[in-house]
Amino acid sequence: MTDGCRPCVFIWAVLLLLPSVIMAYRPVIIVHGLLDGPAQFKVLTNFINESHPGTSVTTIALYDYTASVKPMWQQVEGFKEAISPIMESAVDGVHLICFSQGGLICRGVLATVPHHNVRSLIFLSSPLAGQYGDSSYFKHFFPIFIKSRLYHFCYTSFGQKISICNYWNDPHQRERYLKNSVFLAPLNGEVNHDNSTEWRNHFMHIEKLVLIGGPDDGVITPWQSSMFGFYDDDETVIDMEYQDYYASDAFGLKTLNSEGAVEKCVVSGVQHTHWHSDYSVYQKCIEKWLT
């Protein structure tokens, strides 16, 4: 081989290695929201494959559409069973994108899986601190109720069998919420329970927590719930950093934030059902965290 050909051989060797480099992205798992299913996430899947070629993207087909109103802990167990094999087969870990109600399902999954390997946990407009508002979803399920009266139904044993009621957080009925919430209150460490330390340790295994939301969402109420903020009893929004569960570091949020692991991405002009198909949202808030 002549000296003049050696650079050519080197270049070809590098080019042959490129496909394996390109396909080295971690798998992405998508968890849908209320009244959603995998079909709603085809655009997002395309965004991921265009920017990160070769990425394995799985949208979990479970509790789709009307089945999404099943109790949250029931859904958590089902999604856990579906997600665990994907995590186990991914030596370098996975990324998790969770939309709307799916964000709370993902929180439940990660709190109760001892050795998960989620690297980036991306919450896409999720009611992380709860929901309290007359959105179109609310009126679809509870047409005869107004938000100020829904606690009469949600804070009962029967109401707690419906997903929306599992994270209904009435700021004017704090005692009833803490007493009757079987999902959100224990998950956010707002009530004492035997698993609180264990759940906290599991959740803190993540490397990056990305919170995405915006003021024009129209469904998540208040929209700051997507940033772990929520109303006080005067319906004034109290930001994440001033919430009791943050101050007490009940589930590790304060620690993650102090370590620089929490990223907030606020985008105006995006309606709730458009978050996962808005390319600017993908570019600004999601793409960089999927390596």
Label the model's feature ranges.
Residues 20-21, 84-90, 113, 195-203, ...:
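Surface-exposed acidic, glycine-flexible loop patches that form ligand/cofactor-binding
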Residues 159-223:
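Serine-hydrolase catalytic core
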